[in-house]
Amino acid sequence: MGLADLLIYCGKKYGSAEGNQFVDQIFEAMAVTAYEASIELAKEKGSFPFLIGKNDQETQALRKKFIDTGYMKKMPAHIREGVLRFGIRNSHLLTVAPTGSTGTMTGVSTGLEPYYSFSYFRSGRLGKFIEINAEIVDEYLMDHPERTKAELPAWFISAMELTPEEHVGVQCTIQRWVDSSISKTVNAPKGYTVSQVAKVYRDLYEGGAKGGTVYVDGSRDSQVLTLEAVENELTAQVEPLPVVQVNEPVASGEICPICHEGTIEEIGGCSTCTNCKIQLKCGL
């Protein structure tokens, strides 16, 4: 977390060519350092078992195949040579979590994301909206009293001000140096069509991303993040579910005592109705 803050402190715009070049250098350093450490651990404690064969010849073949994969081909020569000679301690080393709650708690940008806005509302667990103000804006204005919130530099850019293509560019730049999947949302404006969303996924795939999430603004009835503190209201009448007492255990294959339509089957370790999906008993 804190990537957007770092770019702002360095005066580089999130999603720009200059910003992506800077991000690429950061994640390259992280990846190389992580793999160097894992090779050192392999020297001390032994290699990841899947890179150890029944004999030296098979071991070398496994390691050669590993360093010839797409990700490892991007690694510096000394990393590839180290893996070939000593193996590597870890099967995977890098990933990026969303850190939505922890980033907000510590007052920095979350995960790899830009700020959703520099002032917004976040839906809490109790359904109430909490106002979030980015501390980095106040810090900047304290150092530059001649400016106002309406006169921030161009590198103070929020998620909805970026194009989906710029979001994709950042994710694919980072994915180049991350050997597992990463959490990143491509924000799209209201009215984004199905074909446009499909193109975003194609761009992610062709750019080497292992996964992707596209969120079209306003596509859900309620949102976790919003620029307005509009409480979610229930418009439908909610009726309490009937309480049914089951005194005798129900065996697999018997009629469901709740809906009287489905049968009880063992699904995922639980006695579950095939019709109403109620779980009467779980082995766990």
Language-model features: where?
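Internal maturation/activation junctions in enzymes
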Residues: 12-99
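Cysteine-rich micro-motifs
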Residues: 269-280
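Catalytic alpha/beta core of large soluble enzyme barrels
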Residues: 65, 69-73, 82-89, 94-234
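Cys/His-rich microdomains that often coordinate metals
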Residues: 260-264, 280
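Core structural elements
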Residues: 1-11, 169
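Short metal-coordination and nucleic-acid-contact micro-motifs, chiefly zinc-binding Cys/His arrays
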Residues: 250-252, 269
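Short, cysteine/histidine-rich loop/knuckle motifs that typically chelate Zn2+
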Residues: 256-261, 275
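Acidic, proline-/serine-/threonine-rich low-complexity intrinsically disordered repeat tracts
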Residues: 236-248
